[in-house]
Amino acid sequence: MSKGLHRTLSSTKRKVVAITAALTLPLGGMLAFASTSQADEAATTPTVTDDTGTTATGAINVGYFTEWDVYRGYHVKNIVDSGSADKITHLNYAFGYVQYGECRMGDEYAAHERFYSAAESVSGEDDTGALRGNINQLRQLKEINPDLKVLWSFGGFTWSNNIGEAMQNPHRFAQSCYNLVNDPYWDGVFDGIDLGWEFPNTCRDNCDESDPDAFADMMRAFRDVFGDQLVTAAITADGSDGGKIDATDYAAGAEYADYLTVKTYDYFGDWSPTGPTAPHSPLESYDGIPVDGFNGAAAISKLKAQGVPSEKLLLGIASHGRGWTGVSDAAPGGAASGPAPSTREAGIEDYKVLAANCPATGTIAGTAYAHCGSQWWSYDTPQTVTAKMAWAKEQGLGGASFWELSGDSADGALVNAIHTTLNN
């Protein structure tokens, strides 16, 4: 077996780690528990070529597919069946993790060992070759969508804690990632790497001691090693004064990136269990918002002010809602008794479930909310996504990034709203 596979740990051990991460943390996009205390917390790259996977209009539409989706009954074939495979320009496979200064595989079983039957597979045929699992399904997806770009995402909310340590030797870190992403075992599947270092030079459950230049150093190292392949990153959307955007020089890092995903969601949620209720993905501020600067427009404005080119910024859209129970007030700002019950984990639910069981009853700050009995949820709908994409076009942004595909409706309503608006 190849060197890249030898560097990973055993399949069984990885499977346990991946499932645990999926069950215990909100799928990688949260801002450091998003409490009010959060606010207290140069060589030139080659020009991005035409081989970036953009649409005819130049708009980028990224969809995340998570490795642990297989344990929730969602597979690459579902992306095809929903129609979303024809609408996204890039697919990020999330997540690998970082340990001992290197990129590591998250779950070997899900990634390349799980057998797919004809009924489950993109090709409609049983697995017969040595390469199986998600990666083989992604290979089949690219065969029917040859313009689709597939990137391997590393880090995220759970697994980015060790990136600061890895940055003690940026080139070694980047080379290890290159070797895994481009392992001959899955040659041609991946077109580059996406780096989910969400909180450089800031504190979360531990404190990253990188300096403000560390993000740029990382992106430079990855560009040097990956060459013409895609190099992207998912970054914080904390637009508060003195917040997480201010802690890092994102403009310097953007020089080496094809684009940056701004994770403009998970601003508010049940980590404040008694409320106040607030929309987790506000595009703009509103009277009574719990933390100034916790909205998409503030984040984009701050990144532009740093010098990040508009066309390298993607607006984040989430397929999940966040909610509370014990709420009597229909409008935002009400008290609660705790996280709302869910088919997933308390306080977070897929759009496809909420649209059917708790339809939106109002909008605020460019997103939707719903009051159903004693439950209060906020989430985006096709209508609010359409408005957000219109705003993104007005701002000259490069497109959108969607976390994540399994939460969308069976007909891909949210992805379709992104695609339709960006390309009209």
Please tell me what each predicted stretch does.
Residues 69-85, 166-186, 239-251, 296, ...:
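Short, acidic/polar
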Residues 46-183:
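Glycan-recognition patch characteristic of GH18 chitinases/ENGases
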Residues 177-209, 266:
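Active-site groove signature of glycoside hydrolases
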Residues 104-125, 200-348:
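Substrate-binding surface in catalytic domains of secreted glycosidases
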Residues 10-11, 16-19, 27-54:
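C-terminal region of N-terminal signal peptides and the immediate post-cleavage residues
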Residues 1-12:
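N-terminal secretory signal peptides that target proteins for export/translocation
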Residues 69, 352-424:
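Extracellular low-complexity, Gly/Ser/Thr-rich intrinsically disordered linkers
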Residues 91, 152, 195, 222, ...:
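Conserved, mostly hydrophobic/aromatic
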